[in-house]
Swiss-Prot record:
This is Small ribosomal subunit protein uS2. Keywords: Ribonucleoprotein, Ribosomal protein. Belongs to the universal ribosomal protein uS2 family. SUPFAM superfamilies: Ribosomal protein S2 (SSF52313). The keyword Disulfide bond does not apply. It comes from Azoarcus sp. (strain BH72). Signal peptide: none annotated. Disulfide bonds: none annotated. GO terms for molecular function: structural constituent of ribosome.
Length: 251
């Protein structure tokens, strides 16, 4: 789904931070200032936003995985909801250091989470003593909170999408170390350095956050449906040929 300039305005994407907190590296994306608040140039945001969405669309069309990241209070729910809609992994609680660079260890925690979930599903937890069951239940809650959003992520993601790159410096650094492309919302108080696909704009307003997250989720779904259409188109021809052949054999 395409996003219009009007929608960006209505969501307050153009409202940056107070001018005294600005990062000079964001100067190319700043239109001016109003009441000591920097105003983002939406014409430039629009171009960058579309570039980012094209990248996400292509990635999804190639069956790639994009990890959604934002642990900010006002972004958590929105981000998790849109990531789930797109069938993508997400981190909405706390970024655990080494989540990417030490994925081997994270994988062990994911394995444990699935084991505990299976215990609850098949009822084997009921065979434990009350005290043991309570310990396991608490462990499950802790694991679900920290890695529940990435439990189906089999390996490292092909890209990460971050709302507020300054707030998630560790995630950005880990992605850079591993050469994982970063799609990031960058406000006027942060540096766009090291962000492969910059979306210059407000990273605090929940309406703006929803616009970005929905856009990325839509791009993922569009990329995926494109693949399905291609498979159906290619498979459709094959299916017709096979069917004709089998009818001839029957006759």
């Amino acid at each position: 789904m395409t996003v219009t300039m009007r929608q960006m305005l209505e969501a307050g994407v153009h409202f940056g931070h107070q001018t005294r907190f600005w990062n000079p590296r964001m100067a190319p994306y700043i239109f001016g200032q109003r009441n000591k608040i920097h105003i983002v140039n939406l014409e430039k945001t629009m171009v960058k936003y579309n570039e980012a969405m094209n990248f996400v669309r292509k990635l999804a069309a190639n069956r790639g995985t994009i990890l959604f990241v934002s642990t900010k209070r006002q972004a958590r729910e929105i981000l998790a909801e849109e990531a789930r809609r797109a069938g993508m992994p997400y981190v909405d609680e706390r970024w655990l250091g080494g989540m990417l660079t030490n994925f081997k260890t994270v994988k062990q925690s994911i394995k444990r989470l699935k084991e505990v979930e299976a215990m609850i599903e098949d009822g084997s937890i009921e065979r434990l003593s009350k005290r043991e069951a309570l310990t396991v239940t608490r462990e499950l809650e802790k694991l679900q909170k920290s890695i529940g959003g990435i439990k189906d992520m089999g390996g490292l993601p092909d890209a990460i999408f971050i709302i507020d790159v300054g707030y998630h410096k560790i995630a950005v650094t880990e992605a850079q170390k591993l050469g994982i492309p970063v799609v990031g919302v960058v406000d006027t108080n942060h540096s766009p350095e090291g962000i492969d696909y910059i979306i210059p704009g407000n990273d605090d307003s929940s309406r703006a956050i929803r616009l970005y997250a929905r856009g990325v989720a839509d791009a993922v779904l569009e990329g995926r449906s494109q693949v399905l259409q291609e498979i159906v188109a290619a498979g459709g021809d094959e299916f017709v040929e096979v069917e004709e052949g089998s009818q001839e054999q029957q006759g």
